[in-house]
Amino acid sequence: MADALANQLNNTSLGEANSEMRWREQLNMPAKDARPQTEDVTATKGLEFEDFYIKRELMMGIFEAGFEKPSPIQEETIPVALTGRDILARAKNGTGKTAAFVIPTLERINPKSTKTQALILVPTRELALQTSQVCKTLGKHLGINVMVTTGGTGLMDDIIRLNDAVHILVGTPGRVLDLASKGVADLSECPTFVMDEADKLLSPEFTPVIEQLLSFHPKDRQVMLFSATFPLIVKSFKDKHMRNPYEINLMDELTLRGITQYYAFVEEKQKVHCLNTLFSKLQINQSIIFCNSTNRVELLAKKITELGYSCFYSHARMLQQHRNRVFHDFRNGVCRNLVCSDLLTRGIDIQAVNVVINFDFPKNAETYLHRIGRSGRFGHLGLAINLINWDDRFNLYKIEQELGTEIQPIPQNIDKKLYVYDSPETIPRPISNPSQPRQITNTPANTSTADRRHHNHPNNGQYQFNRGRGSYRGRGQGQRRSAQTETNKFGHPQGQHSGKTSTAPVS
């Protein structure tokens, strides 16, 4: 009798073990990312996601999204967040901060309740879309509803959606406050309050809104703040609104180890020529090019297209639906280059970006840090190139000193090992659309301009502005602008505008 019970118990244990192994084998796992990684994400304690004792359904979403092991910020944050304690976390850009708060937030959601149980605030609309998509992807087996709400979209649509159960609300502060003030978004039983890019959200323009939003939450809420930089204003918020927060600081150095930084002294009128040279010499998978103003963004995007390179652009003055489309298409590899303002400096995660170019050098170290952090995501390699004029030399020195980093003069030839991967096809597709194939391919650097134009565009070299898309791709009418003649910031007249963008030279 005892032997029979022992055999039955042994068979049951083996069956459970086999079942434990089988559930992972049945997952729709993405191809393994074979690119090397730096210690920014590999210097861990050796924990596995299973060590956090989270729901199997959540682990299924984690593994199917391509996550393999937790990064340092995830190791430090997830176990503490699961206890409900307030957290103040500081870590480098691109090291896994989003998953560090999304995973414990998802774990604590009760899908049987119809109440909103978590509010995640971010400073920009693009980051709100990206964060909500991460929540949906990781939590796709949990049976929960995630809603994103931002300014620039119809308020009535949000009101209709909030009539149904919304477990996690992701949005920008102004729109969420509007919904809460109208009694549409009920946060009275919402125990989790998360702020990503908290330094931006606690700037003077947002702080009053944040404090009003907190008043709609229960007093025993959990508050979690995440950012790469924490100014003094964060300490003031912590002392006023957080209860004995667990503080995490993984910023032993400020810049990502995988990003190589260079500068080139260039006269203003030679910047476009220098950019053209970089395009012809570098092996770019995808690049983001930053300008300091929206006017320069549009002018530069047009000039890049005239040089024969595919190009999108995005800035804050565009309609939200157009910004969303540009962001979506660029993430999915429709276009190789994106020119933008500082709209996309925070949190935007596009794994395929291996080159960031500061066409206009930023004015402060914080902006510089966030800009270059768009490459080298999650411990991978990247390149940051800064085009410096004579007036920028003091900012260059100041930023080097404040960040404790070295920005080197650009060499004649840049070693491809610093930013190029042996197998670029192994770069993960966007988490928001893992099934959509990439549409860009590598163009040889020595290809002629005409060949590049044919390679990058299916439109036989016609480069009218694609209305409403923020891209110069050869379709549609131009965006109408002021008809009066004005002088652009490159020192040249923009001319008359009548439905097409100006053909004035950028340099």
Swiss-Prot record:
Residues 7-16, 432-449, 495-507 have a biased composition (Polar residues). It is found in: Cytoplasm, P-body. Residues 258-418 form the Helicase C-terminal domain. It catalyses: ATP + H2O = ADP + phosphate + H(+). ATP binds at residues 91-98. GO terms for molecular function: ATP binding; ATP hydrolysis activity; RNA binding; RNA helicase activity. A motif (Q motif) lies at residues 47-75. The keyword Transport applies. The keyword RNA-binding applies. Keywords: ATP-binding, Cytoplasm, Helicase, Hydrolase, mRNA processing, mRNA transport, Nucleotide-binding, RNA-binding, Translation regulation, Transport. Residues 1-20, 425-507 are annotated as: Disordered. InterPro entries: DEAD/DEAH_box_helicase_dom, Helicase_ATP-bd, Helicase_C-like, P-loop_NTPase, RNA-helicase_DEAD-box_CS, RNA_helicase_DEAD_Q_motif. Residues 78-248 form the Helicase ATP-binding domain. The Q motif is unique to and characteristic of the DEAD box family of RNA helicases and controls ATP binding and hydrolysis. Belongs to the DEAD box helicase family. DDX6/DHH1 subfamily. ATP-dependent RNA helicase involved in mRNA turnover, and more specifically in mRNA decapping. Is involved in G1/S DNA-damage checkpoint recovery, probably through the regulation of the translational status of a subset of mRNAs. May also have a role in translation and mRNA nuclear export. This is ATP-dependent RNA helicase dhh1. It comes from Neosartorya fischeri (strain ATCC 1020 / DSM 3700 / CBS 544.65 / FGSC A1164 / JCM 1740 / NRRL 181 / WB 181). The gene is dhh1.
